[in-house]
Structure formats: C-alpha cells, structure tokens
C-alpha cells in the first residue's frame, strides 16, 4: 500500500512531464505512419522518390595492366521496385520504392504481366542472349548511347515486368535520369532474375591449361634477320575523341606508311574533331573515317560494340588486304620504327598479342567486376547486381590495347560458334568489356596457342595517382587510368627486355617535350630553323559547333577578350593611324585556341570577325590574351620556403595534378579549388583563408603538410553564387603569411547563352544570401588579417549587381583586365590597319606553320615523317 501511494504521488507530481512524453511519442508515431504512406503508389507523387546514398568506394586495384579499380557499393537502403497492373494502354508512369516488410502482403502490388511473345517460354540462357543481341552481334546502323543489346521499351512509360530486388538495381533505378534508361534497366534485371539473360555454360575448344605463350623476348640480332615471305600489312584502328587534332596528326605522321590502312572512329560528341578528321582523310586513299559514330564512354559496353563493328567494316573494305589489327588512341605514340614493327610481326604472323592481368583469375574477376551485371544507358554504366561466370571456360583479361591477326578477327566477327555468340551476350552487360572479351574468346578458342601475353605497349601506370575514382560520374565502379609520360619517364620507354612498339599516354597540353625526345630518338631532328617545335595549339571553340557547347563563363570571357583586344588595337598604335585601327566586333568569336609554348600555358587566342569603324570591308583578327600572375610568396623561414605555388581553379585533375580549366576562368556558380605545391622539408600546418571582393572572410581551414608532401588541394563547400570580382586566398602559418594569390570570379554577361537580364543579375551577381558562404562565420578573422573596412566595397558590389547591357560589359572588361593582358593582334588577311601583321607570319598565331603536326604528301619511302 505504501508503494502504491508513493507511485500515485509521483504520478501527480510529474503528470505534466508524462503527458508531454506521451504526446511526443504519439507525434513520432504519426510522422512514421505518414512517411510510410509516402512510399505507397499514389497518383501524382512523382517527386517523392528518395535517392540512395552515393556509391562508397572500396579497395583499390593493383592489376598489372587493367583499368578496373575498386568497386563501389550501391545505396545501402534495401527495398523493392515494383510495377503496378494498370488498365490497358495506361502504363505506370513512375516507380515507387517500398520499404515495408516482405510479410506485409496486403501492401504488395503484383508486377505488370509481360506481353506474350512467340517462343518466349523457350528462351533461356544463351538462347535468350542471342535473341537480345541479334544475329550480327550488334545492332543495325543508328544512334547509340545505350547498348542496343538490351530489350528496348515500347513506349516512354516505365513498366517493370517483375518485382525487382537487389540494392544495386534499386540504386540504379533511383539514379537513372530518363524513363527509357529506367525501362532498359528494369527489363535487363527482370530477365536476369528469371535466369534468361546470362549463359549458364560456354563451350571451350582449347585443350591446353595455363598461359599459352607467356611472352616473346626482344632480340636485336633476330630483329635484323631477313623475313620469310612478304611483309605484313597493318590495319590501324584509331579511336579518338576531344579536340586535340594536332596531336592526332602528329601520331598519324609517325605511324603512317602507304602499305598500311587507317580507320578512324571519332566519338559522336566530338564534332569539331570529326570535321577535321574527315578533311584529313580526303588526302590519302588508305585513310578512312567510320561513316557511323558512337558515344563511347570509359568502361562502357559501347566500346566493345564499336570495335566489333569496325572490325567487320575493315574486313569488308575492297582492296584492304591487311594481316594485323592494331588499335590506337590519340594519346599513343610509337617507340620503335615502322620497319622494326613490320619485321617483328612478319616473324610472328600467326600470333595474337594481348596483355593479361598477371594475377590469379578469382582476384581479377573480383577486381574487374566480371561477377557483376552492368548495363549502359544515359551515357552511364549502371551496376545492377551479381551474376555467375559461365561454367566451362577460363576467363582472362587485362589491357584493352591489342594486336590481333586477321584470322582471329574473322573468327570473332563471322563465326557462328556458340563460344563467341554466348561470350558476346555475356560481355554486353560487362564493365570494361574490351579489357576481357578478346582475351577470353582467344584463350578458349581453337587458336588459343596463338596467344602471346604482351600487347607490345608500355603504359605509364602510377596507381597512387591514377586510381582516384575519376570515372565514378559515368561508371558505378572505381577505375584507374595511366599517367601521361614526362621527360623523367623516358627510360621506361626504352624497353630492352621485351618487344614494345607503342607507349601511352601522351598529352601535349600536359607535356610536349617528351614527344620531342621520342620523335628525335626515332627519326632524328627536324632541319635547323624548323618553326613551332616548342609550340602547341588546341582548339576549345569553333563557330561551326555553335555556342551551345560553351558555358556562360566561357562565352562571357571570349567576348570580353575580343572587346579588350579591339580597345588595345585602337590605343597602342601611332596617333595618325588610329582611325584605321578602330574596329567593332561582329557577332561571336569564330574560334578560340589554347596556346602553349615550352610546356607553359601562354593564354587564349581568339579569332573574331570585325568591322572597321572607318569605311572598309570586314576583316578577321586573331587576338592573344595572356594571363597575369598574381602569386606572392611572402614567407622567409625554412618552413615557409617549402611553398612553391598557390593556385585557384576548377576542373582539378588529381592524376596529372593540374587544373584542366587552363587560365582559371570561373563564374559565380562554379566550385573553385585551392591547390598548393610544396618542396620537401619539415612538417607544417598551414591555414588557408578565402576573402571575397567585399572583404567577407568566406572560409578558413587548416592543411597538414608532411615532410614528403608535394601537392595539397581542397574544394571548400562555399554557398553560391560567389560574389563576382577579385578574390584573395591567403596561406598562413601561425597567422604569419606564407603566400597569397588572387583569382577572378567573372561577372557574367550571358545567362543560358542569352544576354543577362536584370532580374537574373540581381541574384546571380549579389553573392550568397546574407553574405554567408558557410554555416560558420569567419568574419572574426578580419581583424587578425588587417582587412579594410568593407562598407565602400559593399556599396560598389550592390551597384554592380544591378548592371546589365553595356554597363555590365564595362564592369566585366574592367575586372578581366586586372588578370589578363593583350599580348598581340594579327590579321588573317589584308588589313587597313598598318600595325597589324599577317597571322600566318606571326609565331604565336594558330595559323602559323606547324611542321610537326602537318602531314603533307607521301614520300618516296612510303612515309610522311
């Protein structure tokens, strides 16, 4: 009784707290119930689908010559995607994710019944695969972008044919952006769940075990011996993308011989390069361009499809009697002469050269993701779940650069052997299929004894830098990529123990000197006085592409560059000639090039049609805009002397450790990165401070610099839009300055490719809401940093944020002129302005002679170089 009375007394005393707790529990229950209701399939809930967590990278790859790196796991939330039966002609317009338990059968909605198809019940394993791929193994001519081997949707609605399970498939469906891609994913997963997608077993025709021919050693004496029979002829398959036409020409000039054949595929997204390559091919009968084009993403199934289709084309070109198929990219370059290559292949005319991974197969299968199902659509490789390797075969793989005999290519393209047909089906849904398909077919085929474990290449692998998951935005996996060769790597190019005839990768925007060294090693030096040997130009914009490919930042910068240059032309000449040198720009620039000299970025070259202010015909000028350095190294101590440079930019490349956005052009909506280079020295901790144009301390953070650290970089999560104008980044140690740099956030004169309107300018140029770049305020540091009073700068920023039209252009030009200067102008043709030199006589101009990248007529020895 005493205890009961005590309980009642406690209840009376704390009844308010108890009531509050019960109310909170009731509210939580209602919230949970309401959120579970969101998962039900109700009409009009299109936007409530929750995305899974981003992919989590796993361990890194160490395979000898494979691009596959580490796997990423899909979103962690488990659940089901399912379709709902609708009235005829009314497909489900969306999919919903159910998180209810499996035993809650009352909430289940059965999948839409699949349409009847003749012979559907008999499709299983390889038979289903053949039905999907088609008789030829690849689809008829047409657009690409997804793998046509997948069952295609019949309409734009998304109608799952089954109840889809598995976290990988659910994650892919949640992230796919188009209904067609979602439908393809659902169809593939449903076939896979039913066991009708992958072959269960594949026949093996090779009776040998292990590696067939581990390698062939290079023998200088044997290489000089005469060849029995006619010399082999080679079909080079060049797979290119981007805009580096000059580097492609340099490669073609190095490998060209009139006895060989050259077939070039240009990525469907690279229209400028395609136009240039088509023009190039018109000069030579043995150079052709594929009449079709594909979007070939890194690691995608479309790359294998492109190779198979190209091989069939090459086999069917009349008069092209080639013996070997060699694939190259524009970043490859020969390391031995054509004569040495032909002699070597003529002595080994029955061998196929492919580089294997060099590890046990079970480890390779896991690292390469061969035990996972992938599908390509929306220019992305989606991981959809696990699968089994077909029984009965040995799976091999490694590098997707190879040298294949014509007989093996014919076997792969034309055979009706179930080995090839079923492996085509298997590799249609495989990550990096070109790195394994040809290896696996050959190692299980009757020609397995012809395999040599060497692809005749040397690749500049640096896993520490090259395996940074740099392709995770297009592949649900962490991949690796080789590094560019530099002069210090030249000894690696001189392989003496094994035959190597090509090397990769080379990029002239990163380092051209190593190409000069290699070219001299192969062919000797150019004649004395040869121009432009240290210069390199690369197009970034061409009028034929239209402005659609330009960002608003680039469009703003290029047009402002033209205005600055024309103003310079009118003021930097003798007074008497001034009226003849006043020009007005006509339209947008016609082309823009990056200009490098001696492996240093020198600026942008803008070609612009202009109208003289005086009477006269229209002219075309090229203008050179050079960036002005703003780095200040301020420290004097031993630790401070470690700092070598401090840069801010976008498009940071962790593999080559440079900014791909040369010149650092960025706008209010960009996400800049601060990078520091260090010399070796004692450990230190540095503080990085970002200051905006109105002296707002946007952010501050510390970086630890170990004794052997060479590069540090960080992208702070700043709220956008960034305030336009000159920003400052300071590097300090114990609040003593080590260095400082300035960078420009460019005021935009264009928004969505149209002149900026006032209602857009008022938010785009006003900085972040409440001047808060981060959740935490760092303004308390302004006193320590001795920043000026912000009021005058804030008032100027408010006025600038309202500008449009000519006033906005004047502001943009003024800001840009603080970071860029006009280094030169020239005329593409005769000009009324006497101070303008012809561009073809101007050493920095993009039309100046460039013999190293000019092809010219075929010489008496059948070569171009």
Curated annotation (Swiss-Prot):
Pathway: Glycan metabolism; chondroitin sulfate biosynthesis; Glycan metabolism; heparan sulfate biosynthesis. Its EC number is 2.4.2.26. Residues 39-157 are annotated as: Disordered. Residues 37-865 are lumenal. The keyword Disulfide bond applies. Contains disulfide bonds. The keyword Transmembrane applies. Its cofactor is Mg(2+); Mn(2+). Glycans are attached at residues 122, 327, 683. Catalyzes the first step in the biosynthesis of chondroitin sulfate, heparan sulfate and dermatan sulfate proteoglycans, such as DCN. Transfers D-xylose from UDP-D-xylose to specific serine residues of the core protein. Belongs to the glycosyltransferase 14 family. XylT subfamily. This is Xylosyltransferase 2.
